Structure formats: structure tokens, C-alpha cells
Amino acid sequence: MTPHINAKIGDFYPQCLLCGDPLRVSYIAKKFLQDAKEITNVRNMLGFSGKYKGRGISLMGHGMGIASCTIYVTELIKTYQVKELLRIGTCGAISPKVGLKDIIMATGASTDSKTNRVRFLNHDLSATPDFELSLRAYQTAKRLGIDLKVGNVFSSDFFYSFETHAFDLMAKYNHLAIEMEAAGLYATAMELNAKALCLCSVSDHLITKEALSPKERVESFDNMIILALEMMS
């Protein structure tokens, strides 16, 4: 047990899917897993363990932003010995290379947060995912006929008041979208010798101002959930 997770040791499987929204975690458990069991609920940040095609897998919410995400990731790795962490979330596209409903695999994560500089003695950390997880995601997407978009994301501490004039510069450097956690997830996994990857479904396009309806968000997220579960099975 930790200050933020009240699961018992052994409740988590070595593979864990992460979502910012705990209600989305509950949705995945009820719709996609067999024998799903709630294992933690501190602060209503829900976690479940169950089976997908006979293989054990866990789910955990992590809240919004790097600070919240890294708390849960650290505790999952250090206390519960989770070895593979796959974040599945939404993002806002900033590149013409991607559109609504596209699934992005974040091969690198820049950030305006100072957390990685603090942990890396004020140097720039190359926040990148695990190669083997990335390869599995890419190969699974090919098998499922999913056109997986591959590129960098920008993990921002800001949801509002972001510097929108920077979008063109980010796109120039092959940043496909903005989200809020990948840079912290990758850095924490690197520090603690775990494997991590972030997949994001495009729910909004910050350049064209297009956005998915609530129904379309659910449908597009389901495709990413299936990809995530298949690559971990």
C-alpha cells in the first residue's frame, strides 16, 4: 500500500494500461476485460486487474499532468513491480500530418515542465519510450489495419493559456500533438528501469479547430484500447 494506491502487493499484473480519467479506466475494465476486479480507489483514482484473452493485465488512472502521473507511475513501479506501462489518452493535434481519430505513438516527448531538468541536473533529457514496446505497438497496428501515426508530442503543464504561436515551430520539429503526461512518464520509467509507451487518440485539432463529438470520442478511443490490449496480450 502507498499514500495514493490502496491495492495489496500482488494485485497489479506486470503490465498496466494508464489513463488520466479514472472513469475511463472503469469503462475499459467493464467493457473489455474478463474477471475485472477493482483493486484501488484512493481519491477515486480507480485501478482494476482482470484478463484479456486469458492474459492478466491491470488498469490505473493517473490524473492530469506530469506531477500527478509521475506519482502513480513511481508507486506502480517501485511498490507494485509493474514492468510495462502503456498510457492511452487523448491529445490535440498541431500538425497537418494527423487528423481527428488518428492514433499517435509518441516516439519522443518535449515539455515546458521543468521536472525532467530537475531530475537530470538541469540538462535536457531525451524523454523517449521503450523500443520493444514501440515495436510491438507498430506491428500490432499493422496487423489490425490501423494507420498508426509516429512522431513526437509536446507535454505541456498548461491546458489553458498555452502559447499557440509555438504550434508551427513544434510541427516543424515533427511534433504531432500536445498532451500533458508523456515526458514525465518516459523520464520516470527511464529512471526506474521500467518500460513505457504513450499512445494518444486525436480528439481535437488545434490548428483547424475541428473536434470530435462525444460519441466519436468514445468510438475512436475504443480503437486505441483494442490496439493497446492486443499489443500487451
From Swiss-Prot:
The active site is at D204. Disulfide bonds: none annotated. CDD domains: PNP_EcPNPI-like (cd09006). The record marks R217 as: Important for catalytic activity. One of its GO terms (cellular component) is cytosol. Its EC number is 2.4.2.1. InterPro entries: DeoD-type (IPR004402), Nucleoside_phosphorylase_CS (IPR018016), Nucleoside_phosphorylase_d (IPR000845), Nucleoside_phosphorylase_sf (IPR035994). PROSITE patterns: PNP_UDP_1 (PS01232). Keywords: Glycosyltransferase, Transferase. It catalyses: a purine D-ribonucleoside + phosphate = a purine nucleobase + alpha-D-ribose 1-phosphate; a purine 2'-deoxy-D-ribonucleoside + phosphate = a purine nucleobase + 2-deoxy-alpha-D-ribose 1-phosphate. One of its GO terms (molecular function) is purine-nucleoside phosphorylase activity. Phosphate binds at G20, R24, R43, R87, I88, G89, T90. One of its GO terms (biological process) is purine nucleoside catabolic process. It is an enzyme of class 2 (transferase). It holds the Pfam family PNP_UDP_1. A purine D-ribonucleoside binds at H4, E179, M180, E181, S203, D204. It comes from the Bacteria. HAMAP family: Pur_nucleosid_phosp. PANTHER family: FI09636P-RELATED (PTHR43691:SF11), URIDINE PHOSPHORYLASE (PTHR43691). Belongs to the PNP/UDP phosphorylase family. Homohexamer; trimer of homodimers. Catalyzes the reversible phosphorolytic breakdown of the N-glycosidic bond in the beta-(deoxy)ribonucleoside molecules, with the formation of the corresponding free purine bases and pentose-1-phosphate. This is Purine nucleoside phosphorylase DeoD-type.
